[in-house]
């Protein structure tokens, strides 16, 4: 009998234990250990970047990226409203102004057709966020960045193994970042990675993550930084996980496509796109959007699934509707109807790497009951 099916369960069945044990046996558990450098080099190579800078989580990677680009009080950054709060938080903490876009109703990524209308003389960067397993349409973003002299910050936190027109996500930004939270295709428990081809940005991020210690006069500081370091133990997990990334991508695609078959006959729900003209879905999560004609919303659907021992998670809540930003006077009068609908009608079901066929069958059966 299958018990509760969690929305995610990480898979740690490679060299994780061996590498972590090596850290403990040698005493190298801090950020100075060899696994940190190895993880940085191998991950950067995987996404075709010159530099990898390991940090303690994906959110701080955004803070460091914004700081490294010297984004400040006179600047605006364009980004999707349908994203995690870390994106806007990094901009606000830098004293800059976030400017949000609505999203595409089918890919759930930022609507790139809206970008140019949002550009002003104060715009310094576009922050793209690849959502839930499909990438942003990058060609228009790159074209606009070149036309207006803007930087691209690429949030690839959910995009491990994802490609756009055959090129790795994470390779498009002036500076890009990844997350290694337990629900990602690569996990270090907590962790993140900044990648870039720019030597100056890489040096700046390395300094910022390490309290801006100086090479020769360690405790004399020319600037303020943070302790954003990744430990050797975390990096050891990352190296082991990276070794199995192709296997993990294949498993995610299998889960997504099997769900597509199992759920295809349920009326009044929108399933994820398997592919677009420029990408193939890696199904980081398996999202479902209820039709407006459904008599209940995502919150009620998740309650009904929970009663059947099925875990689920709501979609992002739009940034322009966040109470904390309303108190700051941000996004007054902003309307993003697609994101607002996705937030109320969207949720995702169990799709972790440890998911079994038997568990998927149970989820599908519960979905049939809930949606009937």
Task: Annotate each predicted stretch with a short phrase.
Residues 67-156, 163:
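PLP-dependent aminotransferase-like
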